[in-house]
Amino acid sequence: IWLLGVIGFGLLAGIIPLHGWVPQAHANASAPAAALFSTVVMKIGLLGILTLSLLGGNAPLWWGVALLVLGMITAFVGGLYALMEHNIQRLLAYHTLENIGIILLGLGAGVTGIALNQPVLIALGLTGGLYHLLNHSLFKSVLFLGAGSIWFRTGHRDIEKLGGIGKRMPVISIAMLVGLMAMAALPPLNGFAGEWVIYQSF
């Protein structure tokens, strides 16, 4: 039952290899809809996986290991796809996949801690995962709404065609810069905080 639940919720969360809908849905949706996909819909899938893992009785070790492996694959592949992308909304979608993987690493560490009866691992993994889930939702909303504003003003989503946007849209550009710095996990911004807690669990 747990495995079937992970497949179902993993499809909703966009965990690789169940991510096929994510880039197209984000690239073709309006900016507010894309922001909702990234910050609400996909996160519900992660919370569903966590709920299954916590309420499924004594979590065996392989549950945690499976979540860790899926998290590593999703984070790595999502980051690679993001590096090759020029459509700004599709790039943000692939970066969302990377962060879904990072959050899943935290949740997987917490579930592994439950199986091994390690309170520190449980606390760091679950706290880091949930904290980064919240932080990612905040800065990714800013980025998708900023990308939508840029597309509305310029008619372009191709990053290569957005040169000089800082002069045309200074306020949006500053907001996007802050969001991008958080996305890059630069301290002291919120993108750094959750990832730091997750990394402490390893």
Model-predicted segments: where are they?
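Hydrophobic transmembrane alpha-helices and their helix-loop junctions in integral membrane proteins
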Residues: 1-202
